[in-house]
Amino acid sequence: GASAKEIYEECTRLTNKVEASFILDRLDYMHKGGRCSAITMMGANVLHLKPCIEVMGGKMAPTKKYRGRFRQVLLNYVEDRLAGRDDVDPYRIFITHTECDPADVQAVEELLLQHELPFAEILETDAGSTVTSHCGPNTLGILFLRK
């Protein structure tokens, strides 16, 4: 076994290699938490805009907007996150979500199984309290390590 100091150092080293991002189906919870205006929320919901939120330096920031039905947006998002990348560690990838339709989660998993990156493990997890409280239900993300 490793010492507490060794575990801490390894966790700190890996923190800089983590990529975490999410797609939100609706902006209701972002609005309720004061993270977007009512106009932004209504416009996004009416136009079926689904923002991608990336976790960078411990903070969440919007990076890209997708438009359309949630399942197709999820598939486009996964392709965008992984396309043409040679720095993704193919050992393990997480599908993390907040109360998503199991069929949507399954569609993402099937896409990852067919992807050019041969992931050794695809793990499905429930999102933590921070993502859940900020983003609300029907939020899905993929998390992985860079090499």
Indicate residue ranges for each PLM-predicted region.
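Mixed-charge interfacial surface used for oligomerization/domain docking
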Residues: 1-147
